[in-house]
Amino acid sequence: MRKLTILGATGSIGSSTLAVAAQNPQLFEVVALAAGTNSQKMLELCRIWKPKYAAMASLQAAKELSVLLEKHEISTQVLAGDAGLCQVAALDEIDTVMAAIVGAAGLLPTMAGVKAGKRILLANKEALVMSGQMFIDACEQYGAELLPVDSEHNAIFQCLPADIQRAMGRCDLEEYGISKILLTGSGGPFRYTDIAELASVTPQMAIAHPNWSMGPKISVDSATMMNKGLEYIEARWLFNASREQLQVIIHPQSVIHSMVQYKDGSVLAQMGLPDMQTPIACAMSYPDRVDAGVAPLDFSKIGEFTFLPPDYSRYPCLKLAIDACYDGQAATTALNAANEIAVAAFLNNDIGFTDIAIINEQILNSANMATLVDLESVIELDMQARVLAHNIIRKVA
């Protein structure tokens, strides 16, 4: 039986992880849950799952949760702050960490799980975007097992030889006859919208993704295709891929989740309904297969597959991310920080939809791109880029 800590338990990935665990109670035990500020949702989860520990990033939320648990006579121990999140990721009594905290906030607790030698189910793409080679090196140094959860990276993972699956970040694609990884994306809700109309897109329009059910931040990232840009960076590190070995292609139906092209002309694709419980179940049970609670794919109802090259004039954030990926670790760290601030400002109606890419580019051009040597320098640059982004937003808001 796998014993789990779920980082980001109250979010979309956390909910899907718990759904898979509920589908297979004989295989998974939830030992610890962690979240940010939603103490009421965490109370509900504690009532259902009765974890030994619950960690809240917000000190105030941790206090609220303690009061609520005592009131409902639930014995779950409450931990608080970054230290609490890191503690539940490194518990002796767990072997698996679902790393699903959105954004830079997930880096430290995910790295705590790595340093404790856990099996890391990586849904927090920002951890690799921010720390890249440091993260891969830490997995090797501490004996952590890294399994991708993002639907695209999990799809690629499933199409790769077993030797590569066991050596995430340290493989040689050329050695195994792999010529290219094809990273698919739906193109978001505005792939056919007139480019001139994108400036008037509202937050409500941006979070209405046509295929996937996701949180607001990731939905906006999907609309700008920054999400695909971050996934591109993550794929570069997970699969040790060169620029020539990675290609983004738009596939509006979201049925083929990604593909791997081999030297002999073969292309392996992973397909399924757009439901995160499938890649989550794959990572949770690897190398076995379990019931994910997802309906099987009915090919007679799909109709057709469509593939399009990305239009960078429509998706400038995607181009920024691809370029930053090979400009060095500092560039991707700064871009991720700027994008988090810009998306939050857009969701708060402080800036327009097309301003997100403008702010991201300005940060890439103005942040101090010194060499990052450790996590402290990563976090320092992350904070610097956020301050710069806030200052730019104040001027345009």
From Swiss-Prot:
Pathway annotation from the record: Isoprenoid biosynthesis; isopentenyl diphosphate biosynthesis via DXP pathway; isopentenyl diphosphate from 1-deoxy-D-xylulose 5-phosphate: step 1/6
EC number: 1.1.1.267
Disulfide feature: none
Molecular function (Gene Ontology), one example: 1-deoxy-D-xylulose-5-phosphate reductoisomerase activity
Family annotation (InterPro entries): DXP_reductoisomerase, DXP_reductoisomerase_C, DXP_reductoisomerase_N, DXPR_C, DXPR_C_sf, NAD(P)-bd_dom_sf
Cofactor(s) it depends on: Mg(2+); Mn(2+)
Positions with a binding annotation for Mn(2+): 150, 152, 231
Binding site for 1-deoxy-D-xylulose 5-phosphate: 125, 151-152, 186, 209, 222, 227-228, 231
Binding, NADPH: 10-13, 36, 38, 124, 126, 215
Biological process according to GO: isopentenyl diphosphate biosynthetic process, methylerythritol 4-phosphate pathway involved in terpenoid biosynthetic process
Protein keywords: Isoprene biosynthesis, Manganese, Metal-binding, NADP, Oxidoreductase
Catalytic activity reported: 2-C-methyl-D-erythritol 4-phosphate + NADP(+) = 1-deoxy-D-xylulose 5-phosphate + NADPH + H(+)
EC class (word): oxidoreductase
Function: Catalyzes the NADPH-dependent rearrangement and reduction of 1-deoxy-D-xylulose-5-phosphate (DXP) to 2-C-methyl-D-erythritol 4-phosphate (MEP).
Family recorded in the similarity comment: Belongs to the DXR family.
Annotated protein name in UniProt: 1-deoxy-D-xylulose 5-phosphate reductoisomerase
UniProt source species: Photobacterium profundum (strain SS9)
